[in-house]
Design a protein with these regions (language model features):
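Intracellular loop-helix junctions on the cytosolic face of multi-pass helical membrane proteins
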Residues: 1-10, 131, 162-292, 297-302, ...
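Short amphipathic helix-loop junctions that connect adjacent transmembrane helices
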Residues: 29-47, 287-312
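Central cavity-lining transmembrane alpha-helices of secondary-active solute carriers
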Residues: 52-70, 315-328
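Conserved MFS/SLC helix-loop-helix module at the cytosolic interface between two early adjacent transmembrane helices
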Residues: 63-98
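Cytoplasmic membrane-interface "Motif A"-like loop-to-helix N-cap segments
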Residues: 72-84, 334-353
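C-terminal ends and interior cores of transmembrane alpha-helices
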Residues: 85-103, 350-372
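Intracellular juxtamembrane helix-capping segments at the cytosolic ends
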Residues: 115-130, 392-406
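Glycine-rich segments within core transmembrane alpha-helices of 12-TM secondary carriers
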Residues: 135-156, 162, 177-181, 218, ...
Length: 493
């Protein structure tokens, strides 16, 4: 860690700790929400999938609004602080018993974590100059690992409550991590100042205060809007898709207005990779919905005579990423040093291929289920390991890509949009998850066919994504590297 501290700009290392602690409470809900809703509150599997789908979808849609607010109406560090408090307040509301406070608590929490994620990534991105590619890539891989330390801790703790189905005490513990996050942020406040943002250009005190007031009010208004969205989940999912489509068109328009043609070329590459990433995350986000229920009800979770909690099994993802992130970063940097330049688009191709393999493991597990319909735990472990490797080749790479190709004035919007399209994926993935649970039965013999059908479909879709990206990877690389423009200029000369 000291090596990283010497090489990285001031403030980067504290950001890793902020990432880990702020992720903890999200990990609690990410791993336990569907179980909390069905086991403790008594909702059906379909309603649970709808709620979790809205939760995931709007978490990512709010990333876009975080990109708009941060650096324009509120500084990224101030917005992060406010939303971190909201995140903790949402957990506090969920501690209250009964169904009536569920949507209010989830809405408070959702606005908090939805907005502050983009703030965090913007703060980290702004620690580097555009030409600091190697340092920036390494920082985002390590940040991704730190995030998964939070997931790992949340999953471990959640597992202790998997059988009791009493989650109030678990929620109390997660409030403490929000307080720790706030303390670290305040202690290193001066290290997280915005660089080259529109708000920094506002010199008049009155104009700045008006912007800040507008930012605070618009943040507060989001809470009742989220409550409405939870009550009308099907309409909400359609809204997510429409908003994302509009935003992609807006970015295309903004790209055409760029004075530098090279910036427009890079924005076109960004849009291509963003649209294809929707398919990847749509497949990936069946995890916290359908696959969690599959592991809970259709897998023999015994290991060495002990039954392992569902959340602990899901924790394999976090462990692989914590260990794998620095290793993958090191491998990519060594390949670059040897002249082997693995382009962003080709990393995406490998991500899709490995994701397809991960779902084939689940299908094989169902095909070789025992006489009672239970799949072997080994196939689940293989699925989670390969899925995690696929995530490493698209998650941190995408964040680092923004710092490389984005014009300074569009950095927050592009970062928010990149994260927002995951909301479209979550909206679509809940349909696959519902296809897995057409019946409320928990008997594996009854439900295995539904799961097998969907697993095969997801593997095929991932393979299609890999093939499509492979054939356009050269075009995308040229857009990012601006090779076509250089060739055109040479011909003109």
């Amino acid at each position: 860690m000291s090596y990283v501290s010497k090489k990285m700009p001031k403030g980067v290392t504290p950001l890793y700790f902020i990432q880990a602690f702020s992720t903890f409470s999200f990990a609690i809900l990410y791993s336990s929400l569907s179980l909390y809703i069905t086991q403790q509150l008594g909702f059906s599997n379909t309603i649970s999938n709808n709620i979790v789908g809205v939760f995931l979808a709007f978490n990512y849609v709010l990333h876009l609004w975080g990109g708009v607010l941060g650096g324009r109406y509120l500084s990224n560090r101030l917005l992060f602080f406010i939303t971190n408090i909201m995140q903790g307040a949402g957990i506090l509301v969920l501690i209250l018993p009964g169904h009536s406070m569920l949507y209010f608590g989830l809405s408070l929490f959702l606005v908090g974590c939805g907005l502050n994620t983009t703030c965090y990534n913007s703060i980290l991105t702004q620690r580097f100059k555009p030409e600091d590619e190697e340092q920036r890539d390494k920082a985002f891989f390590l940040s991704y690992a730190a995030m998964n330390v939070g997931f790992f801790s949340g999953y471990i703790l959640s597992g202790f409550y998997d059988y009791s189905n009493e989650y109030q005490e678990l929620f109390c513990i997660s409030i403490a991590t929000s307080l720790i996050t706030a303390f670290i942020l305040l202690f290193y406040w001066s290290c997280f100042e915005d660089n080259h943002t529109p708000l920094k250009a506002v010199t008049k005190s009155i104009s700045r205060k008006k912007r800040e007031l507008a930012g605070i009010v618009s943040t507060a208004v989001l809470v009742p809007l989220m409550i409405v969205c939870f009550h009308f989940s099907h309409l909400s999912n359609a809204v997510v898709v429409v908003l994302s489509s509009i935003m992609l068109l807006v970015i295309l328009f903004l790209g055409k207005r760029q004075k530098d043609k090279a910036d427009f070329q890079k924005i076109k590459a960004f849009l291509i990779l963003t649209i294809t990433s929707i398919l990847f995350w749509m497949i990936y986000y069946t995890g916290p919905m359908g696959i969690t229920l599959f592991i809970k009800n259709n897998v023999d979770k015994h290991f060495l005579g002990y039954e392992i909690a569902t959340q602990w099994i899901m924790n394999i993802n976090a462990v692989v990423i914590i260990i794998g992130a620095p290793i993958v970063s090191m491998i990519i940097n060594r390949l670059k040093a040897k002249g082997v330049n693995l382009s962003i688009s080709m990393q995406f191709v490998w991500a899709f291929l490995i994701l397809a393999v991960s779902f084939l493991f689940l299908s094989i597990g169902v095909e070789f289920a025992d006489s009672q319909g239970f799949s072997s735990l080994s196939w689940i472990i293989l699925h989670l390991i390969t899925q995690s490797v696929a995530e490493l080749l698209i998650g941190p790479v995408g964040y680092a890509m923004i710092g490389k190709i984005s014009p300074t004035n569009l950095q927050g919007i592009l970062m928010g949009t990149w994260m927002m399209v995951s909301g479209v994926s979550a909206s679509l993935s809940h349909y696959f998850s519902n296809a897995m649970v057409k019946t409320e039965a928990a008997d594996p013999i009854v439900t295995n066919n539904d799961f097998l059908h969907v697993f095969n479909q997801l593997a095929i879709w991932a393979l299609v994504g890999a093939i499509f990206l492979y054939f356009i990877s050269g075009r995308v690389k040229n857009l990012i590297d601006n090779e076509e423009e250089i060739k055109t200029e040479e011909i003109t000369v």
